[in-house]
């Protein structure tokens, strides 16, 4: 008798000839068997088998069977293939000696006392299993998963028993149809498990009862199918629903992680801001989902001992890592690269990311969010872009300073010191980038510091050259930039000791250059005033007062310069005044005799005292300069000639850099005569040799005075003639 056709939307069971080409539920094809049924039992079995298929496909939950992913489709296909391998084995197996025909026992914890039935008549009654009037498909649709599994397990156990009793020897196709029913219903249950997992995070609330039942049915299946049967039969094979549940969790996490910025692409107008917004949305979604898992989902699974928190956490971590690595492949520019690195290290990697201290990580550490080679490439690309960005920032700082020069803006005075924006801009630039890099990794911090240091070392000479070539050179600006260089040198070197080698030299060089130009401006103003020294006009004029006024005015600017550099500059001014005075005195334009010489000595002594008092009042610490002019004045006006030797000894001991030519020039002012000059020179010869040694080895640094005073080489001839 030909098999009856059916109008059910699901596929019909295949004949044994078609077993090698199993049809999956997704195909939805209908075939009519051309084989004739040998008996009424087979006809009844065919009818009931198709009814079970109709239940599995038309009455099962649409959520479970219409939303099946590619992985679920593969599950159906693998189930069917395994089924027919088992079916072929059943056809080929004959009666064997010692073959057990006992009915497999159902675990008591699963069935709760359900009896086994092995008769052929009972099989016909059980092909459409029901519990309280509901089929397995109805129970799956209503998500009574545990009840559905218990009924399905009864059917499976009964079918195994019938197979063992050789019930289907004459009708193997009936076994195939009933086994397919079991297979499809198991897969329907698995699909419903996946649907429940997908809906868990999508809905506003959590169906705790559904999750608890899901966990119980997975545990029940594991207890019912602890290991594959020895004969390799598809029936009673472990369904691995726990792995299926974990895979569903992973797919759910991947789907949700891909939602933020689904249509966003690199290169859009918003650039880094778009990426930052995408990552902010991603972080917010992951945080909310994991909080929901911890607070609502995990408690529902906890009764069955399911490690839902660890599984969800690892699933989201893996999904975020995959999404971030995809973004990393297309990231361009310093800002985008930093945003990715910063988000991975400081946002997602923060212990406060989940927003609650109770959200603990699993005992085993999570794998790196970004693979080491990807992280290294991002850091390398970031530093490459950073070099160009830092150089561009220094160019902008120079342009900003040049705009201040062009506008003739006077530097501000803050806390009593000239202040230039240069120092603050450089500090902010270096500190900002180094701090940002340090928040990501110590290695990136060190690399960024080297980049900033190298760029600053190249910038300082460029800035110095540009400023000195401008028309803005003035005492306030020079003082402001001396302060800026000094502040950069002290603060940066103290904060980043590793920068000393690269920054010390350019900053000190620039500071000295600015000091030199500051002094040169004053020297150009004072130089003409020294021409009157040791002239007859000098004896009658108050020439020193205007000179000291200029010095005092200049010192007013130095009060707004950082003290170490201000003191150095003031001492240089002090030394310049004394040196220029002595240079004019030792090369007089006019020579005094008699009373004019005495008046000149008194005038020189008064000038020495006035110079000393003025610089002492200004705060100069170069007191070693005070005796130079005074000693020359005393030699010039000494009436007791034998005491001249004592004054020379004091002069030589106080100023080790004095030389024989300077002694000759001083003696020429006094006009002592050739014999006495020879005597004094011989007496001071040993002192001069000792002074020369001290000047070369032990003289304090910076105490140079007479060495820079040039006297005429013909002075010795003049003295000899006298």
Curated annotation (Swiss-Prot):
A matching Pfam family:
Sec6
Give GO BP annotations, semicolon-separated: exocyst localization; exocytosis
Q: Give the Gene3D superfamilies listed for this entry.
A: Exocyst complex component Sec6, C-terminal domain
Residues with Phosphoserine modification: 52, 513
Naming one, the record's GO cellular component terms include: exocyst
Q: Which GO terms describe its molecular function?
A: SNARE binding
Q: Where is this region: Disordered?
A: 1-53, 92-131
Report the family membership.
Belongs to the SEC6 family.
Per its UniProt record, what PANTHER family does this chain match? EXOCYST COMPLEX COMPONENT 3-LIKE PROTEIN 4, EXOCYST COMPLEX COMPONENT SEC6-RELATED
UniProt protein name:
Exocyst complex component 3-like protein 4
Organism encoding this protein: Homo sapiens (Human)
Gene of this entry: EXOC3L4
């Amino acid at each position: 008798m030909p098999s009856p056709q059916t109008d059910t939307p699901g596929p019909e069971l295949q004949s044994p000839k078609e077993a090698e080409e199993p049809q999956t539920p997704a195909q939805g094809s209908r075939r009519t068997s051309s084989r004739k049924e040998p008996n009424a039992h087979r006809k009844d079995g065919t009818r009931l088998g198709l009814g079970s298929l109709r239940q599995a496909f038309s009455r099962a939950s649409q959520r479970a069977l219409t939303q099946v992913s590619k992985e679920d489709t593969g599950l159906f296909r693998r189930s069917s293939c395994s089924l027919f391998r088992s079916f072929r084995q059943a056809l080929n197996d004959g009666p064997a000696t010692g073959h057990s025909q006992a009915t497999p026992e159902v675990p008591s914890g699963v069935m709760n006392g359900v009896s086994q039935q092995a008769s052929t008549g009972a099989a016909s009654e059980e092909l459409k299993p029901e519990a309280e009037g509901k089929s397995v498909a109805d129970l799956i649709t209503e998500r009574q998963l545990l009840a559905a599994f218990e009924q399905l397990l009864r059917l499976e156990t009964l079918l195994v028993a019938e197979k063992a009793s050789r019930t289907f020897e004459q009708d193997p196709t009936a076994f195939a149809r009933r086994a397919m029913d079991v297979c499809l219903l198991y897969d329907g249950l698995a699909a419903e498990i996946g649907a429940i997992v997908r809906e868990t995070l999508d809905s506003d609330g959590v169906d705790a009862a559904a999750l608890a039942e899901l966990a119980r049915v997975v545990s029940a299946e594991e207890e019912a199918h602890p290991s594959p049967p020895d004969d390799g039969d598809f029936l009673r094979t472990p369904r691995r629903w726990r792995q299926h549940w974990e895979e569903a969790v992973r797919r759910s996490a991947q789907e949700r992680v891909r939602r933020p910025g689904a249509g966003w692409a690199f290169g859009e107008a918003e650039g880094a801001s778009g990426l930052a917004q995408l990552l902010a949305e991603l972080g917010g979604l992951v945080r909310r989902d994991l909080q929901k898992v911890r607070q609502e989902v995990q408690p529902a699974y906890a009764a069955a001992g399911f490690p839902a928190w660890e599984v969800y956490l690892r699933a989201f971590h893996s999904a975020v890592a995959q999404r971030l690595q995809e973004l990393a492949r297309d990231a361009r520019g310093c800002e985008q690269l930093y945003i990715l690195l910063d988000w991975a290290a400081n946002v997602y990697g923060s212990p406060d990311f989940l927003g609650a201290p109770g959200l603990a990580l699993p005992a085993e550490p999570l794998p790196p969010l970004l693979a080491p080679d990807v992280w290294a490439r991002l850091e390398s690309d970031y530093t490459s872009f950073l070099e160009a960005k830092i150089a561009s920032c220094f160019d902008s700082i120079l342009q900003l300073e040049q705009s201040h020069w062009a506008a003739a803006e006077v530097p501000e005075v803050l806390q009593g010191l000239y202040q230039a924006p240069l120092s603050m801009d450089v500090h902010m630039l270096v500190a900002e980038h180094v701090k940002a890099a340090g928040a990501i990794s110590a290695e990136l911090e060190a690399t960024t510091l080297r980049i900033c240091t190298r760029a600053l070392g190249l910038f300082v000479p460029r800035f110095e050259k540009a400023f000195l070539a401008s028309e803005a050179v003035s005492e306030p600006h020079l003082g402001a930039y001396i302060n800026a260089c000094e502040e950069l040198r002290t603060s940066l070197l103290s904060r980043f000791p590793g920068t000393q080698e690269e920054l010390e030299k350019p900053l000190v060089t620039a500071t000295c250059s600015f000091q030199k130009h500051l002094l040169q401006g004053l020297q150009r103003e004072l130089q003409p005033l020294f021409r009157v020294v040791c002239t007859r006009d000098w004896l009658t004029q108050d020439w020193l007062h205007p000179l000291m006024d200029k010095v005092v005015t200049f010192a007013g600017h130095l009060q707004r310069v950082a003290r170490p550099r201000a003191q150095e500059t003031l001492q240089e001014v002090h030394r310049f005044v004394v040196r220029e005075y002595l240079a004019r005195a030792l090369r007089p334009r006019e020579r005094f005799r008699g009373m004019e010489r005495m008046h000149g000595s008194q005038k020189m002594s008064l000038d020495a005292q006035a110079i000393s008092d003025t610089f002492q009042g200004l705060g100069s610490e170069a007191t070693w300069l005070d005796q130079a002019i005074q000693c020359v004045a005393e030699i010039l006006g000494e009436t007791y000639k034998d005491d001249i030797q004592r004054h020379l000894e004091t002069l030589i001991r106080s100023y080790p850099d004095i030389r024989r030519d300077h002694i000759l020039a001083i003696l020429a002012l006094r006009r002592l005569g050739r014999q006495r000059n020879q005597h004094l020179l011989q007496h001071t010869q040993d002192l001069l040799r000792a002074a020369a040694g001290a000047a070369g080895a032990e003289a304090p640094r910076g105490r140079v005075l007479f060495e820079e005073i040039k006297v005429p080489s013909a002075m010795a001839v003049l003295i000899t003639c006298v």
